[in-house]
Amino acid sequence: MKQFIRTLVLALIITLVTAPVGAQSLYNAAGMGLPVEAIDGRARALGNLGIGLFGSGLLPGDPAAAGMFIVPTAIIVGQPSWVDYDHGSGNSGSIQGSRFPLMGVGYPGFSGIFTLSLSSFLDQHYKSQRSLELDLRGEKSEVTDLFEQDGSIGSLNFGYSRPIGTSAALGFSFGRYAGSILRQLERDFSTLSFPGALESYQTSSRWTYSGSSLTGGMAANLGTFARVAASVTWSGDLNATASDDTPGMDRSFSLPMQYRLGTSIVLAPGLMITASAIRADWADIERDLDTPTTVGSTSNIGVGVELSRANIFGLALPLRFGYRTGKLPFSLGTGVATERIFSAGLGLSLSQADDIVLGGVDAAIERGRRSGSVLTEAFWRATISLRVSGY
């Protein structure tokens, strides 16, 4: 029975005939899901990967940035998306969903600033169904298989950053992974017409995730025209603990080191460019997966430009444009799936003092495409973040 369930789930993942649900990508079905970057609207609009940007920031991937602007700060980020997909089997459709990938606060202390953030890490939610014919009681009968996987993994991060001199900062954060996943499988026999039709078969399983991470980073301003930043994240094994009524063993998954590098350069007053990169090798996790999945390393890069001279009613209204490209760590079918995104956005300063933004809204709109051997997605994604600073 256990092998039957595993085979049935695998068939549903491969078939991937998906109904519109609250998911943001069908690549959530591959491996451990789709990584979610914990970045704000400004970084999204600039195609930035969350490191090396001028200005205050509470981005988990750039722990030193908070130390460059030591005042109480809070941020919240919301993100809806709309996805059109096309599967190689001929199935196509649309899905949509929303999430809050980042919430964080920072408060000064001990000549630096302490930070606390809750961020998304891996999104695993999707729903699929398929119809097939079975030979029951000597006649062909249609049944429906329904599979839903509801879950995600987030990270609670506690960090500290402090300036080094007047133009640099060091920072670190300790993270605790947490989350759960519920898998539900149902074979629906309700369409059968003969007497004494079979009752629908249902089964479910649940795992709870836990793990730890440690991120360290540095940031430095080169005069007033450039910033460079780098960070490294180490993660221990991600442990999945099965519930008491789940037929299966506890699992453990190897997570990769993540390396980030970013820079911002002011070319002229009101004109800034930015570039960033991130690399992580997920190959070691392949042996921990129980379903065939193409696993690879991710090498993502992003570039962008910000025009900050625009204003409305005396308040800054910077315009931003960006582009990013890279690979997904988990793919359906053979070959590694890729992702490329064009982005644009703007910021609105609600309060500022001496050119320092104390309160503002950053918005971004992205048009992207994910392409693999059996699945292609075209999507729109919006990101809105609210940031407030000051005593």
What are these regions (language model features)?
Residues S94-W234:
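Transmembrane beta-barrel wall of Gram-negative outer-membrane proteins
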Residues M1-V9:
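Bacterial N-terminal signal peptides that target proteins for export
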Residues A23-A30, K140-F147, I265-G270:
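An N-terminal domain-start capping segment
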Residues L8-V17:
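Bacterial N-terminal signal peptides
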Residues E37-A43, P80-D86, L132-E142, F189-S200, ...:
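Flexible, solvent-exposed coil segments and beta strand-coil junctions
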Residues P20-L122, G335:
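N-terminal, post-signal peptide beta-strand-biased segments of exported outer-membrane/organellar beta-barrel
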Residues P72, D188-L192, Q202, V266, ...:
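A structural signal for the main folded, soluble domain(s) of proteins
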Residues D40, A45, T208, S212, ...:
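Outer membrane beta-barrel transmembrane domains
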